[in-house]
């Protein structure tokens, strides 16, 4: 049986921390579905389509990684992909309590789908999409935080926001 994992997130935008987890997950699992959350209650900077395009660009060399969007329950999406695992990244102990609650709920919904946690590389332990957006908004250097294609997309977004 193939090992198939779903790696969910909003990825608004994708950071080197996200990419670290995706790349390492791609070494462990036969297939990894990067599932971009389409949540209409949030106000993301990038559209779902833009986030998916950025993710596809930065994972294009990973043959076993697929980028899709989903809405609704994660376990329903995982079932639709015949996934037996959910892959989550942890930055710090502070992430663990929230992730444990979500994992417990997912186990109630489908006990056949296991959640695997990977600690992010320590150099990205502080990193979040929110921090990246805040630094980029004020024209700070984000070259060590996101891939070049994401940096360029952020600069375009904030330049157009200023122009509007």
Curated annotation (Swiss-Prot):
Biological processes annotated in GO: coenzyme A biosynthetic process
Intrachain S-S bonds: none
Function according to Swiss-Prot or TrEMBL: Reversibly transfers an adenylyl group from ATP to 4'-phosphopantetheine, yielding dephospho-CoA (dPCoA) and pyrophosphate.
Binding site for ATP: 10-11, 18, 89-91, 99, 124-130
Biochemical pathway: Cofactor biosynthesis; coenzyme A biosynthesis; CoA from (R)-pantothenate: step 4/5
Source species, domain of life: Bacteria
One MF annotation (Gene Ontology) recorded for this entry: ATP binding
Annotated protein name in UniProt: Phosphopantetheine adenylyltransferase
Residues flagged as site, Transition state stabilizer: 18
Catalytic activity: (R)-4'-phosphopantetheine + ATP + H(+) = 3'-dephospho-CoA + diphosphate
Assigned GO CC terms: cytoplasm
The protein's Enzyme Commission number: 2.7.7.3
Residue ranges of coiled coil: none
Self-association and partners: Homohexamer.
Species of provenance: Geobacillus thermodenitrificans (strain NG80-2)
CDD domains: PPAT
Positions of substrate binding: 10, 42, 74, 88
Cofactor: Mg(2+)
Localisation per UniProt entry: Cytoplasm
InterPro entries given in the database record: Cyt_trans-like, PPAT, Rossmann-like_a/b/a_fold
Protein family per UniProt: Belongs to the bacterial CoaD family.
HAMAP family reported for this sequence: PPAT_bact
Name of the gene this protein is made from: coaD
Enzymatic class: transferase
Pfam families: CTP_transf_like
Keyword terms of this UniProt record: ATP-binding, Coenzyme A biosynthesis, Cytoplasm, Magnesium, Nucleotide-binding, Nucleotidyltransferase, Transferase
